[in-house]
Design a protein with these regions (language model features):
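Extended alpha-helical scaffolding segments used for macromolecular assembly and cargo binding
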Residues: 196-202
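Extended hydrophobic
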Residues: 2-179, 184-195
């Protein structure tokens, strides 16, 4: 496991940003993902690509930070694959993957399925590396080995950051219901999902 800047978070992140020519945020970003060197490197790369030297204001919430990160990946991948980042191809891929994780695949999806899913989104499949390989290389997705009994030892692909996965899964759940209070109430769709899978047992 990679522990990033753990134990020296603010000092190490500040030094890294300085080396990248990026000003540190005016307000501390407390999300643990911000202490991960790969996460921070991706954000800095996107800023430099846009000729920016500072982070936008308002990254203090998880939602704003993750949206900024996805936008960063989107711009980097769009440049490599020659498409318009406003097409939101990467975001569409992540939403599609998240929709297939619940309820039985929270650890990840079979690699061959994810490769096919991602490459179906590729607007320029004959240009450069495959979209699947680029997303793995950029670190937004990771390859792993399944430990589920029926798939033990098989290669799977998952979101690199667990909270990032949680964020997209939560968005998918909420987007599928008309009234959130009913979905969480006794017998509602989300209530039933949590109950059946024992996600919140006390």
């Amino acid at each position: 496991e990679h522990y990033g800047f753990r134990g020296h978070e603010h000092r190490a992140a500040e030094k890294f940003l300085s080396q990248q020519g990026i000003s540190k945020p005016s307000a501390p970003i407390l999300a643990p993902e911000f202490t991960n060197p790969l996460f921070l490197k991706t954000c800095c790369q996107a800023l430099r690509q846009n000729k920016q030297t500072s982070f936008p204001k308002g990254l203090n919430s998880i939602t704003s930070l993750f949206e900024f990160y996805v936008d960063s990946i989107e711009r980097i991948v769009a440049r490599k694959k020659k498409f318009n980042p406003q097409e939101n191809i990467v975001k569409s891929i992540l939403i599609d993957i998240a929709s297939k994780l619940l309820p039985d695949n929270l650890d990840g999806l079979p690699k061959h399925d994810v490769r096919k899913l991602i490459n179906n989104y590729d607007p320029n499949p004959n240009f450069g590396d495959s979209l699947f390989d680029i997303l793995i290389d950029e670190g937004i997705l990771s390859e792993d080995i399944s430990y589920k009994e029926e798939q033990r030892g098989n290669l799977i692909v998952r979101f690199t950051y667990e909270r990032f996965s949680d964020y997209f899964i939560a968005q998918e759940l909420v987007n599928k219901v008309d009234r959130i209070e009913i979905a969480f109430s006794n017998g509602g769709s989300i209530w039933q999902l949590l109950k059946d899978n024992g996600y919140y047992r006390f």
